[in-house]
Regions:
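N-terminal cap/lid segment of alpha/beta-hydrolase-fold proteins
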Residues: 1-20
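Active-site loop/oxyanion-hole signature of alpha/beta-hydrolase fold enzymes
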Residues: 16, 24, 57, 64-105, ...
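Conserved HGGG/HGGXW glycine-rich cap/lid loop of the alpha/beta-hydrolase fold
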Residues: 16-72
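Gly/Ala-rich beta-loop-alpha elbow adjacent to hydrolase catalytic centers
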Residues: 106, 110, 114
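Flexible "cap/lid" loop of the alpha/beta hydrolase fold
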Residues: 115, 119, 126-159
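Conserved alpha/beta-hydrolase catalytic His-Asp/Glu region
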Residues: 159-218
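Conserved loop-alpha-helix segment in the C-terminal half of the alpha/beta-hydrolase fold
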Residues: 215-254, 268
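Post-His helix in hydrolase/transferase enzymes
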Residues: 260-272
C-alpha cells in the first residue's frame, strides 16, 4: 500500500467484465466488506477510514473497495451504471480477493449495492449492516429531500466546485454536526473529484427494492440518523416492516453518515453484531 496524495492506494482486481476495481485489504479473519456511497469525490477509504481499523483490531479481514466510477477504480464512459452493474463489479472483486462468505457494510448507494448482492448471491452474504441504504424509495421522493436538492443545485449550476462549496455541501447537506465536515475530508474528496467524470452519476439507476426485502434470510443491522437529509424517512418503516431478521438503531443528532458522526457507537455496535448477531 502506498499513499497517493491524501489517499492510500493498494490492490486492484482485474474483473471478469474487463474493469479494474481498486480496494484496500486489511487484517485477517472473517471478511467484512465496506461499500461506500455516491457523491462527488467518493471513495471507500474516505467513507470508512475511522471504522474499518476497529474491526481489523477486533480480528476481521476488512475489504474496502472503490466502486466503479469512483476512487481509484476504472471510470468508464461507454456504459450505463444500473445497480446490477455495481453489484457485479463488487462480486467479481470479491471473487478475485478469494472471498466466499462475508458481512457487507453499506451506506447510501453502498447500502443498495449490499442489498443487491444479498438478494442475488445469498450464499455469499452472512450478515448485512446498512446505514440509510438506497433502494427504499422512488426518485421523486429522493428529489424532495433537502440534501439531494442541495446536491442538484451545486452540480447543476455550472459553477466550479471549490473546497469551500464542497465543505458547505457536507456540513449542511449530509451532517447534523458541521464540525465533521473537516478540511481533511474535503481534501480527500477534492482529490478524487479531479479524476472523476459525470457519467457515473448521470447514468446511475437504483430500483426500489422494498418488494424484495422479505427475501433476505441473513441477520441485518440497520442504522438511521434522525436528521437525515438525503434519504426519505419512509425507508425506516420499509426496513422494519419487510426485513425478517432486523435490528434497527435510530440515532438522534445524526445525519446521513452515522459511521462518521457517531463512529465509536457505530464501531461497537458492528463488532457486537458480528459476534452475536
Amino acid at each position: 500500500m502506498r499513499m497517493n496524495g491524501r489517499l492510500p492506494e493498494a490492490n486492484y482486481a482485474d474483473c471478469a467484465n474487463g474493469y479494474r476495481i481498486h480496494y484496500l485489504d486489511e487484517g485477517q479473519g472473517d471478511a467484512v466488506v465496506f461499500l461506500h456511497g455516491s457523491g462527488p469525490g467518493a471513495s471507500g477509504y474516505s467513507n470508512f477510514k475511522t471504522n474499518y481499523p476497529s474491526l481489523v483490531e477486533a480480528g476481521y479481514r476488512c475489504i474496502i473497495p472503490d466502486h466503479i466510477g469512483y476512487g481509484f477504480s476504472d471510470k468508464p464512459t461507454d456504459v450505463d451504471h444500473p445497480l446490477s452493474f455495481f453489484v457485479e463489479c463488487i462480486k467479481q472483486t470479491l471473487d478475485v480477493a478469494g472471498v466466499k462468505k462475508c458481512t457487507l457494510v453499506g451506506n447510501s448507494l453502498g447500502g443498495a449495492i449490499a442489498l443487491g448482492l444479498a438478494l442475488e448471491y445469498p450464499a455469499l452474504v452472512e450478515k448485512l449492516i446498512l446505514m440509510a441504504p438506497g433502494g427504499l424509495s422512488d426518485l421523486p421522493e429522493y428529489q424532495q429531500m433537502p440534501g439531494m436538492q442541495k446536491v442538484f443545485k451545486v452540480f447543476g449550476s455550472g459553477e466550479p466546485v471549490t473546497p469551500e462549496v464542497m465543505k458547505d455541501l457536507f456540513a449542511t447537506g449530509l451532517m447534523h454536526d458541521p464540525r465533521y465536515a473537516t478540511d481533511e475530508l474535503v481534501e480527500e474528496r477534492m482529490q478524487i473529484m479531479q479524476i472523476m467524470n459525470g457519467h457515473v452519476m448521470a447514468t446511475m439507476q437504483v430500483p426500489v427494492l422494498v418488494d424484495r426485502l422479505h427475501e433476505l434470510e441473513c441477520p441485518v443491522l440497520g442504522f438511521w440518523g434522525m436528521d437525515e437529509k438525503m434519504m426519505p424517512e419512509n425507508g425506516i418503516m420499509a426496513m422494519a416492516r419487510n426485513i425478517k431478521h432486523l435490528r434497527l438503531i435510530l440515532v438522534t443528532e445524526c445525519g446521513h453518515w452515522v459511521m462518521v458522526e457517531h463512529e465509536a457507537m457505530f464501531n461497537r455496535a458492528c463488532v457486537d453484531f458480528l459476534l452475536y448477531g
